[in-house]
A protein has these predicted regions:
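Short, surface-exposed coil-to-beta transition loops
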Residues: 16-18, 69-74, 98-104
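A short, structured loop/turn motif at beta-sheet edges
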Residues: 24-28, 77-84, 106-117, 147, ...
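Hydrophobic pocket/interface hotspot
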Residues: 29-34, 40, 60, 76, ...
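Short, highly charged C-terminal tails/helix-capping segments
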Residues: 152-179
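Hydrophobic ligand-binding cavity/cleft-lining segments
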Residues: 1-56, 178-179
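Short beta-strand segments that buttress and anchor functional surface loops
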Residues: 7, 58-66, 87-94
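Short glycine/serine/proline-enriched coil/turn segments at secondary-structure junctions
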Residues: 52, 67-68, 94-98
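Beta-strand/loop substructures that line and gate deep hydrophobic ligand-binding cavities in soluble
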Residues: 91-151, 164-166
Length: 179
C-alpha cells in the first residue's frame, strides 16, 4: 500500500524520435539548409552566429541571440550532399534535462528530384533519475522541437528565409498575446 503513491521512475537510456515531411525543393537545396558549413544553413540565414571550430572535423558552435550565455555545439557525423546529413549536438549549459541529441536526416528524391521526402531521426539522452512524468514532458517537448525543425526547413526551402522569419515572429507574438 505504501508503494501505491510512490513516483514511477522512467527507465534510463536514450529516447528515439522519428518524423518525416515532404518538401517541394530539391534534395540538394534542402541539404544546404541542413549543412552547418553552408551559408544557406537555416540558422546562419536567420542571422544567428555560427562559428566554425574545426571544418575538417565538422565541429561548429552556434550562439543564439535570444539565449545569451548558452552555446550549442555540433559535431557532424555524416554528410552526403543531397542524400543524408547527421550530427551530435550539445547545449552548454544544459537546458532542462537534455544532455545531447544525435540527429540524422535522410533526403529521398521525389518527382524527378524537384521535391524530396525528409526523414528525420533523433536520439536524445536525458539526465538519469527522471520520473515517468518528467520523461513524458521531455518527450513531448522534443517531439514538438523535431516537428518545428522540419517545418522551418520546409518553409525555408519552399518560401525563403523571410518566410521563416515571419512565421517565427508570428509564433512569438501569438505566445505573448495568449500569455
Amino acid at each position: 500500500m505504501l508503494g501505491l503513491f510512490k513516483k514511477k521512475m522512467a527507465p534510463d537510456g536514450p529516447v528515439d524520435f522519428t518524423t518525416e515531411m515532404q518538401i517541394e525543393a530539391s534534395p540538394l537545396k534542402v541539404y544546404s539548409h541542413l549543412d552547418w558549413s553552408s551559408e544557406d544553413h537555416t540558422y546562419r540565414a536567420l542571422g544567428e552566429h555560427v562559428e566554425t571550430i574545426d571544418s575538417a572535423r565538422g565541429f561548429y558552435r552556434m550562439h543564439v541571440a535570444a539565449m545569451p550565455g548558452h552555446q550549442f555545439d555540433f559535431a557532424v557525423t555524416e554528410a552526403e550532399p543531397g542524400e543524408r546529413y547527421g550530427y551530435v549536438s550539445e547545449t552548454r549549459p544544459i537546458i532542462g534535462r537534455l544532455i545531447d541529441m544525435q540527429s540524422r536526416y535522410e533526403l529521398v528524391a521525389l518527382d524527378d528530384g524537384t521535391s524530396c521526402l525528409v526523414k528525420s531521426h533523433g536520439t536524445a539522452r536525458f539526465v538519469d533519475g527522471l520520473t515517468q512524468h518528467q520523461l513524458d514532458e521531455e518527450m513531448s517537448r522534443m517531439s514538438l522541437a523535431c516537428h518545428n525543425s522540419l517545418a522551418k526547413l520546409k518553409i525555408h526551402a519552399e518560401y525563403g528565409i523571410e518566410a521563416v522569419r515571419n512565421a517565427t515572429m508570428a509564433s512569438v507574438q501569438r505566445v505573448r498575446v495568449e500569455s
